[in-house]
Amino acid sequence: MLKPRYSVDLIKQMAECDANYIRLLKLVPQLAVYRDMTLSNSVKSDKGSTSTNGHLKRVPHRQIESLVGLKVEFAISEALESKGPITVQIKILENFRYTNTLEIVQKPEIKKLLTNPSMIVRIYHDASSAEVISTQGHKVSQSRYLVKNPKMYSADEKMRVNAFLGEWLTHCLKVGRSIRTPEKLFTI
């Protein structure tokens, strides 16, 4: 009996990418500036500076540019062989009006056991979605690959790497703790 051909479940794939967007906003709250800018551009009032409900304000472009290079790091496990704690680092590589590109890597390198995960993730603020565009240096661009392909990707490679990103970010949210102490705990 022939095995049924893999078909892309677009609803499930988009739901995973949308959930990853929410997880990333929780881990890197500075990204909300881009989301707010996207919302303020789409819901302008007559004045052009606030939305009709008065909550969203136009974000100055110079404030957005300052986030490129921002690194957020979370310890997800205790020290391993005196190399320090295992951490996940999220770095903003580039930004445009409606998108950001992030690099997410796990440190330190543990080459004798396994290859540390690393991903390039594109965030689409206008669609409230985040998807993996590269993992371990390999571009993941197709929603479905042929069963026999030169790079030996699975048929649902894109879905699998986005699901792994979701599990990785969820782990950071559950057990991760920030490496850097916040500058302000609260304002009065």
Question: What label would you give each PLM region?
Answer:
Residues 86-135, 139-141:
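Aromatic- and glycine-enriched beta-alpha-beta binding-site module
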Residues 1, 5, 10-17, 21, ...:
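Preference for intrinsically disordered or flexible, low-complexity segments
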Residues 21-24, 28, 72, 88-92, ...:
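Generic structural hydrophobic/aromatic packing signal, biased to beta-strands
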Residues 135-188:
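Helix-rich interaction surfaces within compact, conserved domain-sized segments
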Residues 1-83:
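N-terminal "first-domain core" detector
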Residues 8-12, 16, 109, 152-160:
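Conserved aromatic-histidine-acidic binding/catalytic patches
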Residues 3, 7, 100-102, 144-147:
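Glycine-rich, often proline-containing surface loops adjacent to acidic residues and nearby aromatics
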